[in-house]
Amino acid sequence: MTPANDASATNGSNAFDLTGKVAVVTGTSRGLGQYLARALAKAGADLILSARNRDHLAGFESEVKSLGRRAASFELDVRNHDSILKFAAEAEAAFGKIDILVNNAGCNVRKPALEVSWDDWNLILDTNLRGSFFVAQAIARGMIQRGYGRIINIGSVTSVSGYAGLGPYGASRGGIRQLTMSLADDWGKFGVTVNCLAPGWFRTEQNKVLYENKAWVDYLIDRIPMKRPGAPNDLDGAVVFLASESSRYVTGQTLLVDGGISTGAVHALVQTPLAKPTR
């Protein structure tokens, strides 16, 4: 058997092949969770899906199976520790192992900072940050025993840029970015990599109200160097890379897939040529 640290173990397109791998993706009842899970399935991975209501997963589970992959669905409430532990045990038992975890389950409440309630804050931080940590902890135990794992925490461009009305959400995603680095340092010696995939602005059910506001969309597009929001398949290559042997020496990193908006360019505010430098 080729040693795990042998650089010749994989090469070329085989480095992106997930055949034989089992991936857990949380929050797969809709939106980005389904985009990410679909990409992993197309790359060869078998899938374990989760949502607070298992009934919401039936259609997507059938879609995954139609691709020739194994799939199983379980209930998971990431705000409940007992639910996390039960899910981790069920997921391990389903196909005998877990190679990949995509920590995707999340939520948001958009409000001006002065209107954010105590409950709003707790909902967002408990779901996005605390939930991600304890799901990773529960799943990583088996990965560490087997000496192999790929953990992908889903972050956001809001972890590196400030957006009005997204204070608690940005804080939760900034926490995910830091947590990713800490867990990478903790678990690297066991053969487990931990990285963060941070999408920019994508059209999802969670933010569809925003995209109904033409003025807001025009403002957003002007800030994105690539002049469009993200499309569902724009995340495919990134998640497969982080889940595969291609990223075998990559850990603790945040990969932004955001069309360049995190460069900080604010084109809408720059309408005139730059002034000549003065002496």
Set out the residue ranges of the language-model regions.
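Active-site helix of classical SDR
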Residues: 136, 172
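Active-site loop-to-helix junction immediately N-terminal to the catalytic Tyr of the SDR YXXXK motif
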Residues: 116, 162-170, 182, 206-207
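Alpha-helical segment proximal to the catalytic Tyr-Lys
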Residues: 141, 185-189, 248
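Residue(s) in the substrate-gating loop at a strand-loop-helix junction
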Residues: 156
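The beta1-alpha1 cofactor-binding region of Rossmann-like NAD(H)/NADP(H)-dependent oxidoreductases
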Residues: 76-87, 118, 233-234
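Conserved glycine-rich cofactor-binding loop
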Residues: 22, 29-31
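Substrate-binding pocket helix/loop in short-chain dehydrogenase/reductase
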Residues: 112-113, 117-125, 220
